[in-house]
């Protein structure tokens, strides 16, 4: 796209062939507000922004902290929060279009990756999850290797990403891996939220250089960036400079220095242009200047010709904003937006999420999750070691418990400890599961796979570890304590442990989906498990529990009560115990658990186990429902919040009086405003612009 003339700065109108190869994104009068329903004014995050992004070019959105960089990026990508309202025009190739999974990709600021996988494994699994199932392994492998080469990851392709116990790739390499995952499906538009944040200058350069290579492939790249080095800044084609939600400059990056010079704020020769731009519009530098002057207040400060030292930042910013509105750059941008809005481009092929089949996704997710569990020391291996140590301790403390009268209490105590406290140890896997949930949320938002396939794959991959925990714990304690002999009793004992541990795992999944915070999740999970143990019939017998609430229904929906009752029946029924006083008849196990512990023996122990299984299924279904509600309720709440906001703003004269919105509020509500939606259904906010 060459310029027609240096004076106009306008590019040639793209042809239909060019349109079919790329995505031209344009926005006009884009405004984002957070309503204040009190007496205070409505807060504007973005104010009537105009701009466009074209294929083959990389745009930088710059500005100080709080200037609206991420808000603008989220507005264009359809990821705005539910408590904000967006108005304006957003056009793709001159018309309304869905910003869908196959069209756009979004790289978040945080690199959400499984640290136990290598770079190649991470990209390969992502490819199998999303690429068409009819593609051969060789074709998928070629795409993976090509992506690795494109992002310059060939030197670290066989190194693990890294986590708390394994050192992995560098921060810049992690960022490039995140970018590689998003460009596997060759999206037309790539959004990035501060990809250079936290990176050194060399790593930041390699990341932006990789983005430049992606843009050259005919894709539209839009990235927010905070304060790039001069070498990194030179890689950007276009610049959108923001301050307090207002446009300070939009145009070619190399022309920004000229604009600042024309406005009376030239960039010194040896100063980084991006540093100079931020110095002009960042009010924090006023405090720095005042501090420097204050430290030299004893000496007479000589007059300086530097306008940055003589003018307040608010004055500089206001002058820049006004100069830009009247500049040739703003006129050129509006003219280009008009051209792009009148383009009759070709319809773009949009893929609806992943193109892999459900079964392929299940196999891929199960394999990836199983490898992650095998390599993550804290997921299951540490717990297995703890279970072995605790099982040996329990077995030796209750060794050969016997059949005396005192052994009754010993058997009950041992069974209650195994059912309650040993299953409580499953809470130790919560941190690792929380990290996996972060990956799920990120991939689900990008349309990799569905909720059901994730839940099923997680249980299948964890099944061997849960079996190992149950068999190891059951074998050690059963043989050392010498519970009732017989293989069927041993099998029931192990199954009871297996399903009890599975219930706790499922409960912690529900907690993680509702309270996705490490510390609060542990506290919540521990509290719930504590209630389950208190109502299990071990600390207080079930018949003695208060009938209201605790007995009915809490004890019936507590897996602990069913697991303990089944354990008592499995161990006591068929045994006889010595009486308290010599000469009295022996006590049968049935009398002990029914008369002493209040356990009904009218139904089989297998029904108790079936109740535990039913609770397990209910927790898994609840996990599914919570995830779906989070997913489905988000867009609905956004729409409700948007309508409520616009109704309230319509009655707010302070909102109408602001000069930044030239259109009436009723016009915005009826013609321009659309409900805020998720990325899968965010549409352009209007038909082509009419002048």
From Swiss-Prot:
Short name of any one Pfam family annotated for the protein: ABC_tran
Low complexity bias locations: 660-669
Highest taxon, organism lineage: Eukaryota
Keywords on record: ATP-binding, Membrane, Nucleotide-binding, Phosphoprotein, Transmembrane, Transmembrane helix, Transport
Subcellular location: Membrane
PANTHER family in UniProt: ABC TRANSPORTER G FAMILY MEMBER 11, ABC TRANSPORTER G FAMILY MEMBER 15-RELATED
Protein name from the UniProt record: ABC transporter G family member 15
Organism: Arabidopsis thaliana (Mouse-ear cress)
């Amino acid at each position: 796209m060459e310029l027609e003339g240096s004076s106009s700065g306008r590019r040639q109108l793209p042809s239909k062939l060019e349109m079919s190869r790329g995505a031209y994104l344009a926005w006009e009068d884009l405004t984002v507000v957070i309503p204040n329903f009190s007496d205070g004014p409505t807060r504007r995050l973005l104010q009537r922004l105009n701009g466009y992004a074209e294929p083959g070019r990389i745009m930088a959105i710059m500005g100080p902290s709080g200037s609206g960089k991420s808000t603008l990026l989220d507005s264009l990508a359809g990821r705005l929060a539910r408590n904000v309202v967006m108005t304006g025009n957003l056009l793709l190739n001159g018309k309304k279009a869905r910003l869908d999974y196959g069209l756009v990709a979004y790289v978040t600021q945080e690199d959400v990756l499984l640290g136990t996988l290598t770079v190649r494994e991470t990209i390969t699994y992502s490819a199998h999850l999303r690429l068409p199932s009819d593609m051969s392994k060789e074709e998928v492998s070629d795409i993976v290797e090509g992506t690795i080469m494109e992002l310059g990851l060939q030197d670290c392709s066989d190194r693990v990403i890294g986590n708390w116990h394994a050192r992995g790739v560098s921060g810049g390499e992690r960022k490039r891996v995140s970018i590689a995952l998003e460009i596997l499906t060759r999206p037309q538009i790539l959004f990035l939220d501060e990809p250079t944040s936290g990176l050194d200058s060399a790593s930041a350069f390699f990341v932006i250089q990789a983005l430049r290579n992606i843009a050259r492939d005919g894709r539209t790249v839009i990235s927010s960036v905070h304060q790039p080095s001069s070498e990194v800044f030179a890689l950007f084609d276009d610049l959108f400079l923001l301050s307090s939600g207002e446009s300070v400059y939009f145009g070619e990056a190399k022309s920004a220095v000229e604009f600042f010079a024309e406005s009376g704020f030239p960039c010194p020769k040896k100063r980084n242009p991006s540093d100079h731009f931020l110095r002009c519009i960042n009010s924090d530098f006023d405090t720095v200047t005042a501090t420097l002057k204050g430290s030299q207040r004893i000496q007479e400060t000589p007059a300086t010709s530097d306008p940055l030292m003589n003018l307040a930042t608010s004055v500089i910013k206001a002058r820049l904003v006004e100069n830009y509105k009247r500049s040739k750059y703003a006129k050129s941008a509006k003219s280009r937006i008009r051209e792009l809005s009148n383009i009759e481009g070709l319809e773009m092929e949009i893929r609806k999420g992943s193109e892999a089949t459900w079964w392929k996704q299940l196999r891929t997710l199960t394999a990836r999750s199983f490898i992650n569990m095998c390599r993550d020391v804290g997921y299951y291996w540490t717990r297995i070691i703890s279970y072995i140590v605790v099982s040996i301790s329990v077995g030796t403390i209750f060794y050969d418990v016997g059949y005396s009268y005192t052994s009754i209490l010993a058997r009950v105590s041992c069974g209650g400890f195994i059912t309650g406290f040993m299953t409580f140890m499953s809470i130790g896997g919560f941190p690792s599961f929380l990290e996996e949930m972060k990956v799920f949320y990120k991939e689900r938002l990008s349309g990799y796979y569905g909720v059901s396939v994730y839940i099923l794959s997680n249980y299948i991959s964890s099944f061997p570890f849960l079996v190992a925990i149950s068999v190891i714990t059951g074998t050690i304690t059963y043989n050392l304590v010498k519970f009732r002999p017989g293989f069927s009793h041993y099998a029931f004992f192990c199954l009871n442990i297996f399903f009890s541990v599975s219930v706790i795992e499922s409960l912690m999944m529900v907690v993680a989906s509702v309270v996705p915070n490490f510390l609060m999740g542990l506290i919540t999970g521990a509290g719930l498990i504590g209630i389950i143990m208190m109502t299990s019939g071990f600390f207080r017998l079930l018949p003695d529990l208060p009938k209201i609430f605790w007995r009915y229904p809490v004890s019936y929906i507590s897996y602990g009560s069913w697991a303990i009752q089944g354990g008592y029946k499995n161990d006591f029924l068929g045994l006889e115990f010595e009486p308290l006083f010599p000469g009295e008849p022996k006590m049968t196990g049935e009398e002990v658990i029914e008369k002493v512990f209040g356990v009904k023996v009218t139904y089989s122990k297998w029904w108790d186990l079936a109740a535990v299984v039913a609770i397990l299924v209910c927790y898994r279904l609840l996990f599914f429902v919570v995830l779906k509600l989070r997913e489905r309720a988000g867009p609905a709440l956004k729409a409700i919040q948007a309508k409520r906001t616009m109704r309230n703003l319509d009655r707010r004269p302070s909102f109408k009086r602001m000069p930044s919105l030239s259109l009436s509020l009723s016009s915005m509500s009826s013609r321009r405003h659309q409900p805020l939606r998720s990325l899968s259904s965010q549409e352009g906010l209007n038909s082509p612009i009419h002048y």
